[in-house]
Amino acid sequence: MTKYALVGDVGGTNARLALCDIASGEISQAKTYSGLDYPSLEAVVRVYLDEHGVSVEDGCIAIACPITGDWVAMTNHTWAFSIAEMKKNLGFSHLEIINDFTAVSMAIPMLKKEHLIQFGGGEPVDGKPIAVYGAGTGLGVAHLVHVDKRWISLPGEGGHVDFAPNSEEEAMILEILRAEIGHVSAERVLSGPGLVNLYRAIVKSDNRLPENLRPKDITERALADSCIDCRRALSLFCVIMGRFGGDLALTMGTFGGVYIAGGIVPRFLEFFKASGFRGGFEDKGRFKDYVHGIPVYLIVHDNPGLLGSGAHLRQTLGHIL
């Protein structure tokens, strides 16, 4: 008889839940709920389990916020809870709450070739560190290493490191944003809101007033080639994505590959392919040759957060991935 566990991927707006076959890791019965419609994550879980008529003992839910102890307070939502209390209330034997990019990193060993698009470099080296990052509402970062037949995710808040410009245009962006917001992290330029920041800074650098555009508007105008400022912003976004990925590669020697997740890049995939992304990735001066062979992949799996939550839980329960 198939034994299932509950897996989840929760962001600031939606909560996506599914079942994971503990033996195979297969994800099924995925359903998305609006977080605004429920008073707590526990309430969403109860609705999901009731709707699907299943009883589970184990669960792993990825959440887009730092996980530092038993108490979880979401960054972009009002939900806050004790992991131990939620586990007790649901009657689970095992419940883990993990960072969303911990889940994405743990999905990487489970991905197949059709789930990936490669951007330069050679083949990944088995056993070497892996980096994963992605721009969405924010900028998520994690690393993954393989030790003693176990995958170990190394989460953190790498999206909040300093934005490090390496061209006159990027230095201009930093100067304008610093005057507006003070500290300028990488996330301030590599995210949906970050794309807006890039556009606004480009326009303001020419002593003009920027329009009140959303990330979607900027992307659409750039792809339609109807706004030179939007096209410059999107082009610069791609280059800075490359620079940041190259920084991750240097920091951990990620010869196992660098992986891009998140919801932004797939929206302008052809533009990204033709952009200066790989040039930015390899623009490391004396260490250009060091990163030249490191492959970069875009993850195109529909639910890497769910897949990775399941992988994390299965490994915790003793399965070898």
Swiss-Prot record:
Give the EC number.
2.7.1.2
Entry keyword Cytoplasm: yes
Chain coiled-coil ranges: none
Q: One GO BP annotation here?
A: glycolytic process
- Listed InterPro entries: ATPase_NBD (IPR043129), Bacterial_glucokinase (IPR050201), Glucokinase (IPR003836)
Binding-site list for ATP: 8-13
State the compartments where it is located.
Cytoplasm
Q: What keywords is this UniProt entry annotated with? A: ATP-binding, Cytoplasm, Glycolysis, Kinase, Nucleotide-binding, Transferase
GO terms for molecular function, please?
ATP binding; D-glucose binding; glucokinase activity
What are its GO cellular component terms? Answer: cytosol
Q: Which PANTHER family does the annotation name? A: GLUCOKINASE
- Stated family: Belongs to the bacterial glucokinase family.
Q: What is this protein called?
A: Glucokinase
